[in-house]
Curated annotation (Swiss-Prot), chain A:
Induction: By anaerobic conditions. Its expression is under the control of DmsR. PANTHER family: CHAPERONE PROTEIN YCDY (PTHR34227), DIMETHYL SULFOXIDE REDUCTASE CHAPERONE-RELATED (PTHR34227:SF1). It holds the Pfam family Nitrate_red_del. The keyword GTP-binding does not apply. It comes from Halobacterium salinarum (strain ATCC 700922 / JCM 11081 / NRC-1). Keywords: Chaperone. The gene is dmsD. May be involved in the biogenesis/assembly of dimethyl sulfoxide (DMSO) reductase. This is Putative dimethyl sulfoxide reductase chaperone.
């Protein structure tokens, strides 16, 4: 997001994200690291994972898995956008992108003078963008504000999203990332 | 659950809508101008636009649902390549349902495509490139320009898809091409006294254009006859419905001719002056008597007729009336001759209404009424569509109805009708050399009927690289789908641009996300109404989707033609606007449309386009049709002859596959577009087989059970729907469903890709099947519970087998 910056030190961030298993409120860095992990895998992420795990991560298979799960094409994708899980007219359908919840999220960002970075062509209610915004709130605003945002937005759909992703039988990295993300969002429940 | 209300609470009801002028453009040919309401940068609502030519205000349910096409989560979002594909090791066998893709950058995607084109040309020659574009959109893309510059092969509708009816009509009138022939424009139809809609459900599948004009004519006193095997939305509007058996259309038209001959209801003046009815035909070889045998200096377009006043033959040019015998036989200089009309009457005499009633499943009195109305009530016409040509020898119907209308003199008068979706000639763009650029390498064209051989057998050249757009060819109207899939495995690289991941993009190696129409600036022409439309961009393409123009321009740049594609598409459109005195940006921007020439037009007022300038009710230069169920030496078509393949009662496998299988066009889709719109899928939930309860109960099939529709080519599993509106012996599944919508198999697998020698047209409805209750595993409600309904989708995939 701009003007807030993403944590570019992905190696540190990823390590932090996966190592932070405590019960306390997640740090801004943890939100930021999760956000980085939810983006299209890039060389930084691959390097970070290589540095922190014993096995070498095959960058192409990670990208293919990300594409399969979150970009499509095809029926096994789980579009990582809030409105898709909240604004559909019937439970059986995926909802639209750019629904009313997308607008609500965008309004949160603009309240704080933020908007998704120009390089992000995805709708503003992408899970990664919401996590980046959570990182910003964690760092710059009070706990109640963060709580309100998490309750109004990511917590409202991350379970539905997670169910759909799990149905698509994700590979370990994304299965873990999903668990950590769900857990992180729940943990932040504890007042700071 | 507060999540339902949270969204509503934040929707702003303040602020102003921006109304963006744009237009729809699938292949219903409607090209309806639309108003798109945009608020906070997002599209909120779509309405019909009142265009400059106001009486042509149009729009349908599909157009109103674009919101769910633009914001569909299932859209193609980024350029992608199949992970198992690489230029050096394309692994075409890895395509299909299990193929994995990875997102790539646009620059990389365009590099791969351009390099692939260069490489194929270099290694296999320019004709190893195959360009394919269907009818999915009508905007300015630069596709044709780039293709002409780069060269290669292109496939085309001609011949192959829906080229029968027009072809037969053209053969005897010299007018039109292979598609619907010219007709009086729709605003003249109100003058018709009798309208016969023949094999077309225009109140369901093209209602945005033609239906209102038909109703106007009815209100003005016209009799409406509908010939259709199915009790359709259109049939229910009819004064007389002829529920014909499939494939018997030529029989019916001949029976009408027989009635008209018997009752002397033919238009003598028209036949003498504008047809070759009086032309003298040699009895020995069926050719026309040579004018040079009658006069030393015959006029170029002259025919020999018999003048009953002088008692001798004479040569007359086109558009000439006189005391010419319409019937009779003479011996002239030892040669026995008769008139062309004599031969036609002789042919019609074998098809009296009483006999045809039996063959075609009709009442003789109804046939006579239809013929009587057409011949005696005043000007009228026949409005067929492509459906009636979807039989192997369907072109004969084109010849037949052209001939029938010649008998009744229904050409060149107010109130005559010859086709649906009439042409207004004014909606064109002054494109200059845009589609025919300097330095063009040129492309060779192959009809779809030849492309399967081209791909499968390298006959006559082996194609290696295919670029496709605006088309879901593997989802719709390409029969024997398995053969296409096999044939395409000979291609090293398949590149496809689309808005959605269709059953066709699934077979691609490189997928390019195209912009939705509302995300483009464009100029749209049409022939179905006298308006030219401007598309204003409602917002930028979502994700990384691109207007096809910019895809073409990106490729052009890499292929050495960058200077021929302006960086900004607007500059191209600007060129067309500046070329054209009728157009101005102010008007286009403000109103969205410019009215073009909307004068009602009467067609066929001049000499016909045949050699003689006359309709050849006797075609002395007739082709000999060859194909299944015809005699080995073929059938020569001087006069209309009912030819049938699989619809014939004595077809070799009629006992094994007793049911005829049709794939009607649906009101819920235009071909396969809109199949993924949730609002529409709420109503039109899944593919079904329309089957008469008699046929179903005979097979132990309950209403709503899943059935396997099968023949020796393939099968498809769909839900049976008891339908009293479909005649026993005929079943129907609407076309345009996507592979994933079928429980198992695919509609296209059942249809033969075989074409006849003359017709050269896929015969979608010339198909026989048997229907049995599907296996128990398909009877559970699991399918419907997980029915994809458009945007989601985890159902069994029709591609997996």
């Amino acid at each position: 997001m701009t003007p807030a910056t993403r944590n570019n030190d992905s190696a540190v961030a990823v390590a932090d994200a996966f190592d932070d298993t405590g019960d306390g409120p997640p740090t801004a860095a943890r939100f930021a690291a999760l956000a980085a992990c939810w983006r299209q895998p890039d060389d930084d992420l691959q390097a970070a994972l290589a540095a922190e795990t014993d096995t070498t991560v095959d960058a192409q298979s990670l990208r293919a898995e990300y594409t399969r799960l979150f970009v499509g094409p095809g029926p096994s994708q789980s579009p990582p956008y809030e409105s898709v899980y909240r604004d559909g007219e019937r439970d059986a359908d995926l909802g639209p992108v750019y629904g009313s919840s997308t607008q609500a999220v965008a309004r949160w960002y603009s309240e704080y003078g933020l908007q998704p970075a120009a390089s992000e062509s995805a709708p503003p209610d992408h899970l990664a963008t919401e996590l980046e915004f959570a990182a910003y709130l964690r760092e710059h605003e009070g706990a109640e504000t963060l709580e309100q945002f998490l309750t109004e937005h990511p917590r409202n759909w991350v379970e539905s999203f997670a169910r759909r992703v799990r149905d698509a039988d994700p590979k370990p990295f994304y299965r873990t990332l999903l668990n950590v993300t769900v857990d992180t969002l729940a943990r932040a429940d504890t007042p700071l | 659950d507060d999540s339902d209300t949270a969204g509503d609470a934040v929707t702003s009801f303040l602020g102003e809508d921006q109304v963006v002028k744009t237009a729809c453009s699938p292949n219903c040919r409607g090209k309806c101008p639309l108003d798109v309401f945009v608020r906070d940068g997002q599209i909120k609502k779509v309405e019909q636009q009142v265009p400059a030519a106001k009486t042509f205000k149009r729009g349908c349910t599909l157009g109103m649902t674009h919101l769910q096409r633009v914001y569909n989560a299932d859209r193609l979002k980024y350029p992608m390549k199949r992970t198992s594909w690489s230029p050096d090791d394309p692994q075409p066998d890895q395509r299909g349902a299990d193929a994995q893709f990875e997102r790539i950058a646009w620059d990389d995607a365009l590099d791969l495509v351009a390099d692939g084109i260069q490489r194929a040309k270099r290694e296999y020659g320019p004709r190893s490139l195959l360009w394919h574009s269907g009818s999915g959109d009508g905007g300015i893309t630069g596709y044709r320009r780039l293709k002409e510059l780069v060269g290669g092969l292109q496939d085309d509708f001609t011949y192959g898809i829906d080229t029968n009816v027009g072809q037969g009509f053209n053969r005897v009138t010299g007018e039109g091409g292979v598609f619907m022939p010219p007709t009086n424009t729709a605003d003249d139809w109100v003058n018709a006294e009798t309208i016969i809609i023949w094999g077309s459900d225009i109140f369901a599948s093209q209602f945005q254009m033609d239906a209102e004009w038909i109703l106007d004519a009815k209100r003005n006193g016209a009799k409406l006859v509908v010939v259709d095997p199915v009790y359709t939305n259109t049939a229910e509007k009819a004064d007389l419905w002829l529920p014909i058996k499939p494939g018997k259309d030529t029989h019916l038209a001949l029976a009408m001719m027989q009635y008209i001959f018997e009752h002397d209801h033919y238009d003598e003046a028209f036949l003498r002056s504008r047809t070759n009815a009086p032309a003298l035909v040699r009895a020995d070889d069926g050719t026309l008597l040579d004018p040079a045998s009658v006069t030393a200096t015959p006029p170029e377009d002259g025919i020999v007729v018999f003048n009953t006043e002088t008692g001798s033959p004479e040569v007359v040019p086109a558009e000439t009336n006189g005391p010419f015998a319409l019937f009779g036989e003479w011996t002239i200089d030892g040669t026995t001759v008769h008139t062309g009309l004599t031969a036609l009457r002789e042919q019609a005499s074998s098809y009296p209404p009483q006999a045809v009633a039996d063959t075609a499943g009709l009442a003789a009195a109804d046939i006579e009424t239809a013929a009587d109305w057409l011949a005696t009530r005043g000007p009228g016409g026949i409005m067929p569509s492509y459906g009636v040509g979807r039989y192997l020898y369907g072109h004969v119907f084109g010849q037949t109805y052209a001939t029938l209308l010649a008998l009744t003199g229904d050409y060149g008068r107010h109130g005559n009708i010859h086709a649906q979706h009439p042409s207004y000639d004014g909606s064109y763009l002054e494109t200059g050399d845009w589609n025919d650029p300097d330095g063009a390498a040129g492309v060779d064209t192959y009809g779809y009927n030849r492309v399967l051989d081209l791909l499968a057998n390298g006959d006559p050249v082996q194609t290696k690289f295919m670029y496709g757009m605006n088309s879901n060819m593997l989802g719709n109207q390409f029969p024997e789908r398995d053969r296409w899939l096999d044939a395409m495995s000979n291609l090293d690289t398949v590149v496809w641009a689309d808005i959605y991941h269709t059953p066709t993009t699934r077979q691609a190696d490189i997928i390019l996300p195209a912009a939705h129409w509302f995300e483009t600036e464009d100029l749209l022409t049409t022939y179905t109404h006298p308006n030219l439309s401007y598309r204003t961009k409602a917002h930028d393409p979502l994700w990384e989707a691109r207007d096809d123009y910019y895809i073409m321009a990106g490729l052009a740049q890499r292929l050495g033609h960058g200077d021929k594609f302006p960086d900004d598409k607007h500059d191209v459109l600007d060129r067309f606007v500046k070329n054209d005195d009728r157009l101005s940006w102010d008007a286009l921007r403000e109103t969205g449309t410019v009215a073009t020439d909307e004068t009602p037009t009467v067609a066929y007022t001049d000499e016909f386009g045949t050699e003689s300038g006359r309709i050849t009710v006797y075609d002395d230069d007739a082709p000999v049709e060859e194909g299944p169920a015809l005699p080995d030496d073929g059938v020569s078509l001087e006069v209309p002859k009912p030819l049938e393949a699989r619809t014939a009662d004595d077809w070799a496998h009629a006992d094994e596959y007793p049911l005829l299988f049709m794939q009607k066009h649906s009101k819920w889709r235009i071909h396969s577009q809109w199949a993924n719109v949730p609002w529409l899928r709420e109503i039109n939930t899944e593919p079904q087989l329309d089957i008469h309860p008699k046929d179903a109960t005979r097979r132990g099939i309950d209403d709503g059970e899943y059935v396997r529709v099968h023949n020796d080519r393939g099968s498809v599993v769909v839900r049976a729907k008891y339908n009293d509106g479909i005649q026993p012996g005929l079943v129907n599944t609407d076309q345009g469903w996507w592979a994933r919508d079928f429980v198992d198999g695919h509609l296209q697998d059942l249809i033969s890709a075989e074409t006849a020698k003359v017709g050269r047209t896929f015969a979608f409805y010339d198909c026989r099947v048997e229907v049995t209750r599907a296996a128990d595993e398909h009877q559970s409600n699991e399918y419907t519970q997980h029915n994809p309904r458009g945007s989601s989708g985890t159902a069994t995939d029709g591609d997996s087998s």
